[in-house]
């Protein structure tokens, strides 16, 4: 008879703690925060991936704050408006007026990579680049929050009542590009974002190998299912860390011209194929390979591709069927009946697979219709894709369950597009929050809008559900504009340019960098020194002799100032 086995108490306790944590995670998922969220894994999976030492993250408080902010805007039909911040100066100025902060991959790529090597937005910088910028700004936010508290607690109550409180801790939403590789790369990227201070992250559905700025050409999509895997990987990492980090799914389906694979049936209706039967057999990639082997290069290869594509009569399968029905030798009413039946079965909402669409075409009398999506594939193996708002809507439906907001990247500020996408995606996901890129890549003056329409654009699309709107590169452009105009003026007018265009403007607009020593926290560290040294220090940075006293209202200096050239002026304060 086998001896009975007694489970050690340590093992029992380990299991008890594990099961308690599983129940805790499940209860968390059952809260209102995750009512619309679908997960492809269980609470047991999450707890098994955690360590035994529980950790908390400051970014989670801001993630919860971000969620409340966005849900309030959604309920009110308004929008959180923000832009890409370059540095701590910008993030502290933005805190006075805006309720969220954006960190752009484009801005990081061009101005602040972790290797210090700048370049265009191709997501080829090290993947810690944007998390590092998030940390840079998040540390600044926390520092200025500490600095403000010290300053306010040094005031009497009456002075505090007169001094506006600034919430420096505005939630940061960061650019996660494509997730920087496979699922494990996305997991590690998201871990970095949480640790570095991001309250939200967006991830797009381009190929990580060929990723481009959303307003460049040559964009290649991944399959719907692959991007869902990225979103699942991101959410899993947030769950493992116990955070409510806001996840934004971006789609580039409007302007994309290529897609990596045809493996997902939801993509089938948007893939282009050759409809000219005279090209049956050898594909474009084979023609190009043979031409290269024969010594052809550059313009010659481009001419071969252009000529082949010109003959291919590229169409979606739906367009091919529609054209074939119109050419049938039938009475007009019968053609129209078949067209109506085809459109009823093949509308984009149905998301027919190619095989299903073929079956419908056969029932309509088109059993051997020539259409081939493999023939026009590129040398890299990509399929041709017909980008459209409809393609973005289909992807929005698919992504919505796995994210918190959906962002459709567009090529212009088009109210018709915004309305079409919002109405389309909300037919299946009515509670979905939307994001919109108020891109500086658009020539807004060429958009057809007048000034009033531009001013009303944000509130108008906010009513459609776009509750987070952002200018990706406004920090970059604002920085360039002020430095270029000031440098030009300074070269011409010297110190008058600085005083007139910067110092006086800072004073008249109440910009706190006018007193830059105070802004940088010299008073804060004077208090640190006094605290360390028993309440007194002879080396205080803001003590007697600091030039910043010249910016106080009570300060004035009269008398002669020697200019060094034998002349003197009577100095006076401009207060």
From Swiss-Prot:
Main location: other
Compartment(s): Glyoxysome
Pathway stated in the Swiss-Prot or TrEMBL entry: Carbohydrate metabolism; glyoxylate cycle; (S)-malate from isocitrate: step 1/2
One GO BP annotation of this record: tricarboxylic acid cycle
Active site: 213
Enzyme kind, highest EC tier: lyase
EC number: 4.1.3.1
Residues annotated as binding Mg(2+): 175
Ranges annotated as spanning the membrane: none
Binding, substrate: 104-106, 214-215, 250, 437-441, 472
Needed cofactors: Mg(2+)
Motif (Microbody targeting signal): 573-575
Organism superkingdom: Eukaryota
A single GO cellular-component term on record: glyoxysome
UniProt-recorded Gene Ontology molecular function terms: isocitrate lyase activity; metal ion binding
Reactions listed under catalytic activity: D-threo-isocitrate = glyoxylate + succinate
CDD domains linked to this entry: ICL_PEPM
Keywords, ordered alphabetically: Glyoxylate bypass, Glyoxysome, Lyase, Magnesium, Metal-binding, Peroxisome, Tricarboxylic acid cycle
Annotated function: Involved in storage lipid mobilization during the growth of higher plant seedling.
Family membership: Belongs to the isocitrate lyase/PEP mutase superfamily. Isocitrate lyase family.
Subunit structure and binding partners: Homotetramer.
Protein name: Isocitrate lyase
Lineage: Eukaryota, Viridiplantae, Streptophyta, Embryophyta, Tracheophyta
């Amino acid at each position: 008879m086998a001896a009975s086995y007694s489970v050690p108490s340590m093992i029992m306790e380990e299991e008890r703690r594990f099961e308690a944590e599983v129940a805790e995670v499940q209860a968390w998922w059952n809260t209102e925060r995750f009512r619309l969220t679908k997960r492809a894994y269980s609470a047991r999976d999450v707890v098994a991936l955690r360590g035994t030492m529980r950790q908390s993250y400051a970014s989670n408080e801001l993630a919860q704050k971000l969620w409340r902010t966005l849900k309030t805007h959604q309920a009110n039909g308004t929008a959180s408006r923000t832009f890409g911040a370059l540095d701590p100066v910008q993030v502290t100025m933005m805190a006075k007026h805006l309720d969220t902060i954006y960190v752009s991959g484009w801005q990081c790529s061009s101005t602040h990579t972790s290797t210090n090597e700048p370049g265009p937005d191709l997501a080829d910088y090290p993947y810690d680049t944007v998390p590092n910028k998030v940390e840079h700004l998040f540390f600044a936010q926390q520092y200025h929050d500490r600095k403000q508290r010290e300053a306010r607690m040094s005031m009497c109550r009456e002075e505090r009542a007169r001094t506006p409180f600034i919430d420096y801790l505005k939630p940061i939403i960061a650019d996660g590009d494509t997730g920087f590789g496979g699922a494990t790369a996305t997991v590690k990227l998201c871990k970095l974002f949480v640790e570095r201070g991001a309250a939200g992250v967006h991830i797009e559905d381009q190929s990580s190998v060929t990723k481009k700025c959303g307003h460049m050409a040559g964009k290649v999509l991944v399959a719907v299912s692959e991007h869902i895997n990225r979103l699942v990987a991101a959410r899993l990492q947030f769950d493992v860390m116990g955070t409510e980090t806001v996840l934004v799914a971006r789609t580039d389906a409007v302007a994309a011209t290529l897609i990596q694979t045809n493996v997902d049936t939801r993509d089938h209706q948007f893939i282009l194929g050759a409809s000219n039967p005279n090209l049956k057999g050898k594909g474009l990639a084979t023609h190009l390979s043979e031409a290269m082997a024969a010594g052809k290069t550059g313009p010659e290869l481009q001419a071969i591709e252009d000529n082949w594509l010109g003959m291919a009569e590229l169409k979606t399968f739906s367009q091919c069927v529609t054209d074939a029905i119109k050419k049938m030798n039938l009475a007009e009413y019968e053609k129209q009946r078949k067209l109506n039946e085809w459109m009823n079965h093949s509308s984009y909402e149905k998301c027919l697979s190619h095989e299903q669409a073929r079956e419908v075409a056969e029932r309509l009398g088109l059993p051997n219709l020539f259409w081939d999506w493999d023939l026009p594939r590129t040398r890299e193996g990509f399929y041709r894709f017909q980008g459209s708002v409809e393609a973005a809507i289909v992807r929005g439906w698919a992504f919505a369950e796995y994210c918190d907001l959906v962002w459709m990247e567009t090529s212009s500020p088009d109210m018709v597009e915004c309305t079409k996408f919002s109405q389309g995606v909300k037919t299946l996901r009515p509670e979905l929050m939307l994001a919109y890129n108020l891109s500086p890549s658009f020539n807004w003056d060429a958009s057809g809008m007048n000034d009033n329409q531009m001013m009303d654009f944000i509130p108008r699309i906010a009513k459609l559900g776009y509750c987070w709107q952002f200018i990706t590169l406004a920090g970059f452009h604002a920085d360039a504009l002020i430095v270029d105009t000031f440098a030009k003026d300074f070269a011409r007018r010297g110190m008058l340019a600085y005083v007139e265009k910067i110092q006086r403007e800072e004073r008249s607009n109440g910009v706190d960098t006018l007193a830059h020593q105070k802004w940088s926290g010299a008073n804060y560290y004077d208090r640190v020194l006094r605290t360390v040294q028993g309440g007194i220090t002879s080396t205080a940075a803001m003590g007697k002799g600091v030039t910043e006293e010249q910016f106080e209202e009570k300060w004035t200096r009269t008398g002669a100032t020697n200019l060094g050239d034998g002349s003197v002026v009577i100095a006076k304060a401009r207060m």
